[in-house]
Amino acid sequence: MNPMLNIAIRAARKAGNIIAKNYERRDDIITMEKGKNDYVTNIDKASEEAIIEIIKKSYPNHTIITEESGALEGSDNDVQWVIDPLDGTTNFVKGLPHFSVSIAIRVKGRTEVGVVYDPIRNELFTAVRGEGAKLNDLRLRVENKRDLSGAVLATGFPFKQAKYMPMQFRMMESLIQEVADFRRTGSAALDLCYVAAGRVDGYFEYGIKAWDVAAGDLIVREAGGIVTDYHAGHGYLKAGHIVAAAPRVLKEMLNKIQPCLAEDLK
């Protein structure tokens, strides 16, 4: 096994165990608002600390970028670990059992390893660039649909930037003319993994951060899917908007999404 993948899996499982254990102890969860509609808990921080400790033991010089602590610069900035210690914090706080740990390893700007762990279902999604994607020991391939007919799409709402909600509804109104239904699960990392696993046929969202999608992005691509931003480009880790699906489905999604974009995103 790729040695960095091994460490990423170990870190994700350790963090997942902390999250799952505390999910059952609701009175011990301390929630703080770090921005409008944006929450962090003591469990996010405990999960993050566990991940950082495991990475630093094996790779003390690597840079670590996390949702809660920002960038922890190492002497080797070519290797960056991009971490969301609890993707789906709102679900966790509300007692909805759908959240994950997301860890990506980027080397010289290219994602080489992706790990997403769902501690409630004990599902471990992994990918190594050029080696495919897996769910536990099962190889993943995207559902190779030819068009949007009958498709189920995952999405998220721009709850931190409400001015883009009309755009979101325009996109959904356009897509629903072809697709069967939508799902809004509250974990971008798992939405991407579900595209890779064929559980949903595509995913689109505005308002994501790099740590939300860096691991899931590689998992989709290694499962044979395509990931772009709303302009069909590859700047989604910085742009904050993302589309993922099998090739033909993605093309049709973009054809529906692009005419609906807000003026400042065109």
Where are these regions (language model features)?
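Acidic beta-strand-loop-alpha-helix segment within the catalytic core
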Residues: 104-192, 239-266
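Short, Asp-centered acidic motifs that coordinate Mg2+ and/or phosphate
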Residues: 63, 113, 152, 201-202
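Residue-level signal for inorganic ion chemistry
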Residues: 19, 44, 55, 89, ...
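Oxyanion/phosphate-interacting regions
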Residues: 1-10, 170-177, 190-266
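N-terminal subdomain of lithium-sensitive/metallo-dependent phosphomonoesterases centered on the IMPase/IPPase/PAP
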Residues: 1-86, 248, 259, 263-266
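Residue-level detector of anion-binding/catalytic polar loops
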Residues: 18, 61-63, 181, 201, ...
